């Protein structure tokens, strides 16, 4: 499909990733890191998905705007994304909020996070800008979205999901005509507009926008001069373009990278503990909807130098094994069992311990005889010998962060308070 053009449009584009959000609904999991820096899938970080999509789509100029507790995010990107080469017209810029426009002003909104760095963007002279949220899990070819943008002559093209209307109230929702030209855009409406010909479904914004660079610069400068603006794409920029220009919807089904043709598209907002937990466990399915084994569309991340995973002991009641689980490098499962779980790098499980439906972040240690069910362990947690979680809801709720569905988040501080 790409040979329609003499060269991919992605070569003329710059991806700009908005990665400054806290993600407060993830509770203590984001106390010390921004949401895009949260671990996912056994070895990656959430931001790796947007960045990998950009690289795999052919985009070689990338900027990442950071703000809230950005140290771990910046450190990760410096280690994992340092392979871009200026001599090949490639660039990777990390852009922390730094009062570049005003000494009293940090990033005030998503649009402002782009506006404050217009001079840096201009230095690369991209023809198109692809604005991305850095906190979603999905695979997508942005080149196909760029192509629709150019062919439609739109001022902005918005990536969108087809979702049931009853589920669309938490999104920015678009009303469209039969050609997918956007006629209205409303943030989190109580009564979302339906899709023509399929009124039970709605088009929800993915937080992905494609602009011609000149148009984007002009509208951001105009917005910056408006004292009533909240400096936000969803609240201010997009509704204004819908009223006064041409906005087009790009359906995710047209550019998603599927695990297989017969498998539905996969996109997840992992903004709550339950959503984060379930998206991780999705990867333990026999045929997961999100294919992390696809060498044609890999998820790039930091390649830590570490030993392979190891399973030891083979006795009745003390057999090191994992079933329907993802076990990362440097893990040791010593006479323990993991069922439908993800063990990130460097996890150690002591003899006679078990975990079932568990998301265990890097360098955790699970003591002998501990039993864990439906848990998220923050990185570096040391579970005491014999601790049981997931069998007594009232006790779990007093000691840990427990969701309504029974998922328990456990942090170092919570374990310290048990003593």
Curated annotation (Swiss-Prot):
Job description of the protein: Involved in the biosynthesis of ADP-glucose, a building block required for the elongation reactions to produce glycogen. Catalyzes the reaction between ATP and alpha-D-glucose 1-phosphate (G1P) to produce pyrophosphate and ADP-Glc.
Main EC class the enzyme belongs to: transferase
Organism placement in taxonomy: Bacteria, Pseudomonadati, Pseudomonadota, Alphaproteobacteria, Sphingomonadales
Lineage: superkingdom: Bacteria
Record organism: Novosphingobium aromaticivorans (strain ATCC 700278 / DSM 12444 / CCUG 56034 / CIP 105152 / NBRC 16084 / F199)
Protein name per the record: Glucose-1-phosphate adenylyltransferase
GO molecular function, one term: ATP binding
EC number: 2.7.7.27
A Pfam family reported for this protein in Swiss-Prot or TrEMBL: Hexapep_GlmU
Assembly behavior: Homotetramer.
């Amino acid at each position: 499909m790409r040979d329609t053009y003499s060269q991919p449009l992605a070569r003329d584009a710059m991806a700009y990733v908005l990665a400054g959000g806290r993600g407060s609904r993830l509770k203590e999991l984001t106390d010390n890191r921004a949401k895009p820096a949260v671990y996912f899938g056994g070895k990656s970080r959430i931001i790796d998905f947007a960045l990998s999509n950009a690289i795999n789509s052919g985009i070689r100029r990338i900027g990442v705007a950071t703000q809230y507790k950005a140290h771990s995010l910046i450190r990760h990107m410096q280690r994992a994304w340092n392979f871009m080469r200026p001599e090949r017209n490639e660039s990777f810029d990390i852009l922390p909020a730094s009062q570049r426009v005003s000494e009293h002003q940090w990033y005030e909104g998503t649009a402002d996070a782009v506006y404050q760095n217009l001079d840096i963007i201009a230095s690369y002279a991209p023809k198109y800008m692809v604005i991305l949220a850095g906190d979603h899990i999905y695979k997508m070819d942005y080149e196909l979205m760029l192509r629709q943008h150019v062919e439609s002559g739109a001022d902005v093209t918005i990536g969108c999901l087809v979702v049931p209307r009853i589920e669309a109230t938490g999104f920015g929702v678009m009303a469209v005509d039969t050609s997918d030209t956007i006629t209205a855009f409303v943030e989190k409406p109580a009564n979302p507009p339906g899709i023509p010909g399929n009124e039970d479904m709605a088009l929800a914004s993915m937080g992905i926008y494609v602009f011609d660079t000149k148009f984007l610069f002009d509208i951001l400068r105009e917005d910056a001069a408006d004292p009533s603006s909240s400096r936000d794409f969803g609240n201010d920029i997009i509704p204004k373009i819908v009223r006064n220009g041409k906005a087009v919807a790009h359906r995710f089904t047209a550019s998603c990278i599927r695990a297989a043709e017969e498998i539905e598209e996969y996109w997840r907002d992992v903004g709550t503990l339950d959503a984060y937990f379930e998206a991780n466990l999705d990867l333990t399915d026999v045929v997961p909807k999100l294919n992390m084994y696809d060498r044609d569309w890999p998820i790039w991340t930091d390649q830590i130098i570490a030993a392979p995973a190891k399973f030891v002991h083979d006795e009745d009641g003390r057999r090191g094994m994992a079933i329907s689980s993802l076990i990362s490098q440097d893990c040791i499962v010593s006479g323990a069992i993991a069922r439908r779980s993800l063990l990130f790098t460097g996890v150690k499980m002591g003899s006679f311990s078990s975990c079932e439906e568990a998301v265990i972040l890097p360098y955790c240690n699970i003591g002998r005889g501990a039993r864990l069910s439906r848990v998220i362990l923050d990185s570096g947690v040391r579970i005491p010998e014999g601790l049981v979680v997931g069998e007594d809801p009232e006790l779990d709720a007093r000691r840990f962060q427990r969701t309504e569905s029974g998922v328990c988040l456990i942090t170092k501080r919570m374990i310290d308070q048990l003593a």
